């Protein structure tokens, strides 16, 4: 299984991208959205199921970071896609090293400093 952990600040786009990439490579997926965007995570996964992705190919786990921590300790993971903070990415990497009997890919996008410009044109 491939674990996809998405952030609160881009809850739909990033989760869809992570799930789509993992499924298209033939992986079963565990989706774990941020605890702040559980409803959106549920709706994204439900839409995948409505489009024909089998329940057995895409599972949803809801909860806070403790659930994410436990999921990264599953010793049968084939990979992890994570978007979030650098400290959390380092914890995931540590869990993967400690709990896997093989090298497991970690795709971590961290740091996400996004700027937004607002000017009078938008009012």
PLM ranges: what are they?
Residues 1-123:
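Rossmann-like NAD(P) dinucleotide-binding subdomain of oxidoreductase/dehydrogenase enzymes
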């Amino acid at each position: 299984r491939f674990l996809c952990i998405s952030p609160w600040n881009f809850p739909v786009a990033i989760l869809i991208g992570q799930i789509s990439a993992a499924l298209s490579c033939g992986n079963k997926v565990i989706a774990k959205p941020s605890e702040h965007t559980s409803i959106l995570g549920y709706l994204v996964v439900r839409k995948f199921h409505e489009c024909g992705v089998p329940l057995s190919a895409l599972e949803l786990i809801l909860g806070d970071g403790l659930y994410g921590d436990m999921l990264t300790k599953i010793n049968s993971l084939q990979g992890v896609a994570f978007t979030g903070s650098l400290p959390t990415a380092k914890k995931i990497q540590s869990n993967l090293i400690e709990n896997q009997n093989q090298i497991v890919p970690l795709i971590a996008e961290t740091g996400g400093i996004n700027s937004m410009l607002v000017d009078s044109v938008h009012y």
